[in-house]
Amino acid sequence: MNRQREFYYYAEQVTKRTGVGLRKMQSQDRHREVAEARYCLIYLMRHKMKLTLMEIAKLMRRHYSTVHHGLEVMHILQVTMKKYTRLKEIKRYEHHNIRPRDTMYICN
C-alpha cells in the first residue's frame, strides 16, 4: 500500500509540472508531451523509489525494454536540457507528504 501511495505522489508531481495526467501517461499516446511526462515518471520511479525495470513496466503498462529506453532518453535530456535536471529537486516521498484523497484528481 505504501508503494502505491509513493507511486501516486510522484505521478502527482509530474502532473503538476507537465499537465499530463496519470491515465494519459499510462496510455498508448505517443505525442511528445505525453512521452516526456511518462519518461519523467519512469525516471522518478527508478531513482527515487528504487524499483526494477519490470516493476516500473507493470505500473506503467509497458514492456521493460520501453522503460529502459525511457531512462536512456531521460539521461540524454538531463545532459542537454537544464529543465530536466530539476527532477532531482523533487522531494523524496514520506508518508506525511500526501494524503490518499490528494491523489484522486490526477487521473484525467
Regions found by a protein language model. Name each.
Residues 46, 71, 78:
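DNA major-groove recognition helix of helix-turn-helix
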Residues 34-51:
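Short, amphipathic alpha-helical "recognition" segments used to contact nucleic acids or chromatin
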Residues 11, 52-53:
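Helix-turn-helix DNA-binding elements, focusing on the entry/boundary residues of the two helices
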Residues 11, 77-104:
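Short Lys/Arg-enriched helix C-cap and helix-to-coil transition segments
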Residues 63-67:
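Helix-turn-helix DNA-binding helix
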Residues 16-38:
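Short, Lys/Arg-enriched anionic-surface-contact patches
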Residues 54-59:
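Short alpha-helical "recognition helix" segments of helix-turn-helix
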